[in-house]
């Protein structure tokens, strides 16, 4: 399948099952809130956020029709089609670690795209300062495709 995005798109890794400190619902809700804020601050880009797109996967997972490996395969295919990558780091996550390795190798993103600050608590200027390098690199990649 050939995946093409119509505007600069950044894959947003986030904890789903994570390290057990929060529920899946809490992790996904937090990721969506952070992504919404980032997209308000940077209207020139889109974020691909697994929490926004995984309802069908969740149905299949609950019915035991797919495995973690199946989900990771799909996520990595989507990541490869994106123009950038960042990780909303909410704690240890095997899936995010795998996405980080893929992003560093294929998308050629540096590991410092791991966002350790709580973007929800950052003001507009701080959010721009933290994410400007990631967004600018994604926009450049999009223009060069």
Residue ranges and their predicted role:
Residues 1-145:
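Conserved catalytic or regulatory cores that recognize and/or transform ribose-phosphate-containing ligands
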